[in-house]
UniProtKB/Swiss-Prot annotation:
Record: residues binding L-citrulline: 99, 135, 139, 192, 201, 203, 280
CDD domains: ASS
Pathway(s): Amino-acid biosynthesis; L-arginine biosynthesis; L-arginine from L-ornithine and carbamoyl phosphate: step 2/3
Biological process (GO), any one: urea cycle
Assembly description: Homotetramer.
Species this protein is from: Variovorax paradoxus (strain S110)
PANTHER family named among the record's database cross-references: ARGININOSUCCINATE SYNTHASE
Residue numbers binding L-aspartate: 131, 135-136
Family stated for the protein in its record: Belongs to the argininosuccinate synthase family. Type 2 subfamily.
Protein name: Argininosuccinate synthase
Enzyme Commission number(s) from the entry: 6.3.4.5
Gene Ontology terms for molecular function: argininosuccinate synthase activity; ATP binding; protein homodimerization activity
Pfam families to which the protein is assigned, alphabetical: Arginosuc_syn_C, Arginosuc_synth
Binding-site residues for ATP, renumbered to this chain: 17-25, 43, 129, 131, 136, 194
Length: 446
């Protein structure tokens, strides 16, 4: 039986994820007029562009909500954000610059916590503002049904009647004004923005054109570092981790993760740290483009990865990175709480993060330009005396290395025999002027 309702569920309670913006305001009032009983739920995710959270539920009641609740999701979001950092759950990168999956993390928290609040009010129909072309419609669908298996989904933007009557922002603004609310449509930006405490996403409209760059974006979590007139002074900052969790910035410990992340945002934001321009694959495989901000997570990740590489061996780091990319994709797809994601996350938290204790000192400059000045940890396996070129008591002797190299003869002989087999079968051809074989199609590429 379908869990998606295509018409207004008149006479029934409908929970709506309410942001206070024009879209959800018009949808809530429209549903009320069509006979539904709307309940409004607003997630406080520490959005940097939200000036007054308490005003949002009051708006919802004014527009016809039977009840309106503000759900503080910040502590949970902070915990999930640090879990993602510990596991390196970030798969979208361009030339080493990372997107920190801040929107998928926000959806995981919003989708579960709002639906849990709805269950408390005996509300089992949920609507939100996600469109059918995006990722969020699937993320919210999964998280909603994981939290409440009896949930039904009603999205006004999938209801043809709503689209016919209020198909655009101008129509919504006129509808609210006619209803006596005097709702003024805000000026259209050249892109849309979605944010939470961990980061901000700017996309759509002019940013869909690849000839429009980061320069058209007005950052909300930091400075426009690319502008010559914006002064950015170099700054030295220290980040301390204990068993994989960040605990102090510049020697100042913070009582909770929320406060620490907010302070990390302020520090990184002064430099425009963590901004990136990414082309990515949406869940439906179509490509989209976004400009991202995440100054705090970027700062913490620099320190965390420095400690990871100084503490763990190569094979552990390889597994951490491979699993992190897989976990990042699962997070992006709305599968953060699926068993396969929990397995990868728990492994990284237990066997990688728990050993990460120490402090990293970083010099921040402009944008993503930085230098690591010092790394201190009781768990470092980096020991310079082992490889020192000075005359010191080494961990091994020249004779030890001769023996190690001699043992390599076994696999070198095996490799030569395999190359000879490939040459006889025509896969390789003898190199010109060298004993090293060449691929048989090397000449064809010239």
């Amino acid at each position: 039986m379908s869990t998606i309702l295509q018409n207004v569920p008149a006479g029934q309670k409908v929970g709506i994820a309410f942001s206070g913006g024009l879209d959800t305001s018009a949808a809530l009032h429209w549903m009320k007029l069509k006979g539904a009983i709307p309940y409004a739920y607003t997630a406080n995710l520490g959005q940097p562009d939200e000036p007054d959270y308490d005003e949002i539920p009051r708006k919802a009641m004014l527009y016809g909500a039977e009840n309106a609740r503000l759900i503080d999701c910040r502590a949970q979001l902070a915990n999930e954000g640090i879990a993602a950092l510990q596991a390196g759950a970030f798969h979208v990168t361009t030339a080493g610059v990372t997107y920190f999956n801040t929107t998928p993390l926000g959806r995981a928290v919003t989708g579960t916590m709002l639906v849990s609040a709805m269950k408390e009010d005996d509300v089992h129909i949920w609507g939100d503002g996600s469109t059918y072309k995006g990722n969020d419609i699937e993320r919210f669908y999964r998280y909603g049904l994981l939290t409440n298996p009896n949930l039904k989904i009603y999205k006004p933007w999938l209801d043809q009647l709503f689209i016919d009557e209020l198909g655009g922002r101008a129509e919504m603004s006129a509808f609210m004004t006619k209803a006596g609310f005097g709702y003024k449509m805000s000026a259209e930006k050249a892109y849309s923005t979605d944010s939470n405490m961990l980061g901000a996403t700017h996309e759509a409209k002019d940013l869909e054109n690849l000839d429009s760059g980061m320069q058209i974006v007005q950052p909300i979590m930091g400075v426009a570092f690319w502008k010559d007139e914006v002064e950015v002074k170099r700054e030295t900052v220290s980040v301390r981790f204990e068993e994989g969790r960040p605990v102090a910035l510049n020697g100042v410990e913070h009582a909770n993760l929320v406060e620490l992340i907010l302070e990390a945002n302020r520090i990184g934001g002064r430099h425009g740290l963590g901004m990136s321009d990414q082309i990515e694959n949406r869940i439906i495989e179509a490509k989209s483009r976004g400009i991202y901000e995440a100054p705090g997570l970027a700062l913490l990740f620099i320190a965390y990865e420095r400690l990871v590489t100084g503490i763990h061996n190569e094979d552990t780091i390889e597994q951490y990175r491979d699993h992190g990319r897989k976990l990042g994709r699962l997070l992006y797809q709305g599968r953060w709480f699926d068993p396969q994601a929990i397995m990868l996350r728990e492994t990284a938290q237990r066997w990688v993060a728990r050993a990460v204790t120490g402090e990293v000192t970083i010099e921040l400059r402009r944008g993503n330009d930085y230098s690591i000045l010092n790394t201190v940890s009781p768990n470092l396996t980096y020991k310079p005396e082992r490889l020192s070129m000075e005359k010191v008591a080494g961990a091994f002797t020249p004779l030890d290395r001769i023996g190690q190299l001699t043992m390599r003869n076994l696999d070198i002989v095996d490799t030569r025999e395999k190359l000879a087999i490939y040459t006889r079968t025509g896969l390789l051809s003898p190199g010109q002027g060298t004993a090293v074989p060449r691929l048989s199609n090397d000449d064809e590429t010239k």
